[in-house]
UniProtKB/Swiss-Prot annotation:
Summary of the function given for this chain in its UniProt record: Could be involved in insertion of integral membrane proteins into the membrane.
Pfam annotation, one family: YidD
Protein family (similarity comment): Belongs to the UPF0161 family.
Membrane topology per record: Peripheral membrane protein
One GO term describing the cellular component: plasma membrane
InterPro entries: Membr_insert_effic_factor_YidD (IPR002696)
Chief site of localization: membrane
Protein name, per record: Putative membrane protein insertion efficiency factor
Localization: Cell membrane
Keywords: Cell membrane, Membrane
Amino acid sequence: MMKKFLIALVKAYQRWISPLFPLSCRFCPTCSVYMIQAIEKHGLKGVLMGIARILRCHPLSETGDDPVPDYFSLKRKKTPLDN
């Protein structure tokens, strides 16, 4: 129940707020998609993972693939393409 509510909040952001701003996410998947995937995979801990991801997404950060890891982590998972 809580997962569905949190995901609905992110989807509302995607639909009504995100279109008001230019594309700016430096990662794939986007931060909002990452948040949804993290919540689906890790429940409430996924919210913390999503917030950590948003804090990593700024002009001075690296770009590239940053998938949701299978384990709880607040750090970016490096992929072979990042090297």
